[in-house]
From Swiss-Prot:
Keywords: Acetylation, Disease variant, DNA-directed RNA polymerase, Nucleus, Transcription. Belongs to the archaeal Rpo11/eukaryotic RPB11/RPC19 RNA polymerase subunit family. It comes from Homo sapiens (Human). GO terms for biological process: transcription by RNA polymerase III; transcription elongation by RNA polymerase I. PROSITE patterns: RNA_POL_L_13KD. This is DNA-directed RNA polymerases I and III subunit RPAC2. The gene is POLR1D. CDD domains: RNAP_I_III_AC19. The modification N-acetylmethionine is found at M1. It is found in: Nucleus; Nucleus, Nucleolus. It is linked to Treacher Collins syndrome 2: A form of Treacher Collins syndrome, a disorder of craniofacial development. Treacher Collins syndrome is characterized by a combination of bilateral downward slanting of the palpebral fissures, colobomas of the lower eyelids with a paucity of eyelashes medial to the defect, hypoplasia of the facial bones, cleft palate, malformation of the external ears, atresia of the external auditory canals, and bilateral conductive hearing loss. Component of the RNA polymerase I and RNA polymerase III complexes consisting of at least 13 and 17 subunits, respectively. Pol I complex consists of a ten-subunit catalytic core composed of POLR1A/RPA1, POLR1B/RPA2, POLR1C/RPAC1, POLR1D/RPAC2, POLR1H/RPA12, POLR2E/RPABC1, POLR2F/RPABC2, POLR2H/RPABC3, POLR2K/RPABC4 and POLR2L/RPABC5; a mobile stalk subunit POLR1F/RPA43 protruding from the core and additional subunits homologous to general transcription factors POLR1E/RPA49 and POLR1G/RPA34. Pfam families: RNA_pol_L_2. One of its GO terms (cellular component) is RNA polymerase I complex.
Amino acid sequence: MEEDQELERKISGLKTSMAEGERKTALEMVQAAGTDRHCVTFVLHEEDHTLGNSLRYMIMKNPEVEFCGYTTTHPSESKINLRIQTRGTLPAVEPFQRGLNELMNVCQHVLDKFEASIKDYKDQKASRNESTF
């Protein structure tokens, strides 16, 4: 029972509210009755292949993860089902959180490099304009 409360506490930080004042969960954790915490399906609402495949890749880099895959429920629905199965004693929510954090770090790195390249380009363009006068 304490493990379930701890697991719920960990994923509660990942839940968000949607617009229009209506509270809607962006993330659900689905576990079949009688299964353990090592094999869990996460339902991510308002997401598609962009997040699904990137997150699956990041999670599969973890050696403790035995399986990670995702499906889109239907082309007209914007939600994905992400299934994670771990080896040993690691609960599935751990590599899920780690994968999200690592993916955010990669995205931040790409953004930083992109902004630095834009700045370099603008600086080079400005120096060329100054040298022509």
